[in-house]
Amino acid sequence: MKKALAFLLAAVMLLGLGTVAMADSVTLNVVTSYGGDDGNRANFEAAVKAYEESTGNKVNDGSATSNEEWKAKVLTDFETGSEPDVLFFFTNADAEPFISAGKVVSIDEIRAEYPDFATNMKSSMMAVAADGKQYSVPSSGYWENMFVNKAVLADCGVEVPGPDYTWDQFLADCETIKAAGYTPIACSLVEVPHYWFEFMVMNNGTVANHLDVPASADDAAAAKWAAGLNDIKALYEAGYFPANTLTASDAETVELFNAGEAAFLIDGSWKVGYFTQNAADLNDFAIAYVPGKGERSASEAIGGISMGYFITRKAWDDPAKRAAAVEFVSQLTSDEVLSTFVTTEVTALVNGASPAGLNPLQQSAADANANITAIAGAVQDLLTAEARGDLFANVQNVVTGKISAEDAVAQAIALN
């Protein structure tokens, strides 16, 4: 009888514990852009499943395809009080309406209670809102950096550039490469001068002020733009670009690099796919660093992480959901989970992403991205199409001395 009573009491206690666990579990309303047609949909579903299994919580997934209609609905939901608990959204000006309305919680406020929140991220690569605070935990994005042909460099006795690569080292390497009969820089200045323009502007400024657009022809931003154009001119005059850089297409100069006739190519993360499909041997290529000059380090690059996870005020102020929301974002942005979402994309992870199954060039990109200390978006994106077109059309005129760099900048900003 005593044994039976003891068994019954134990069963009641277990049932009670189960009831408490069920009562403590919550359902989070989550909205992301990982809709059905997104390439990372399966990775997102796997991460959500792991979260649910590890916490006992449930996720009401409101993900959809990222488009203007989706963005408008997200903003409308905040206006009507129908916002989710966790939102994966753009971190640029698109987020300002709900940030300025106090509808999301800052990273600092979250860390006051959860000190380890998002500490696996580089603060310098986290988006800053208009009020100077950070609100989102970043995911991944694009990068622009320098591809190198290792076979060419080896034949010239030149080392693959590291994150401390300097402008003086670069100029010396270019001279060595040129003397060996190779083209140092693969680039069509008539079609894609913008890659070099971005980095030369940053080399004459800082990553912090890279997105400053000239307001007049004689302000500080205009001066660094002109200095950047003059650096491109100096490279042209030294004979470091292809002989046909003013007439060749981008495809032609990229193939020059791919064929082992040129050493350096500045391009973006999207170009990795091209070489994966077209390179004879991916081991001949690597992602390195654009040489630094002045205050810019070679470990600072052009790129962008345009989206991140926000915790809404609604979830934060709900005692039942606060911890659940923090844990959800922490899991979705952990080193392990975020690594499943990327191949070569840049992340803000302190330790860098560790994606699996990468080919040699993809692995090289992942290794390089792990050393990136800061990124800035492309300043050309802040220009009108007319101003941008005029500026880049004049690059060939600047390098050939038909127009001064200062006049080219003044002419472009007059159209902006």
Role assignments for model-derived ranges:
Residues 90-145, 171, 196-202, 284-288, ...:
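Hinge/lid segment of periplasmic solute-binding proteins
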Residues 6, 21-96, 100-101, 112, ...:
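Conserved N-terminal structural module of periplasmic/extracytoplasmic solute-binding proteins
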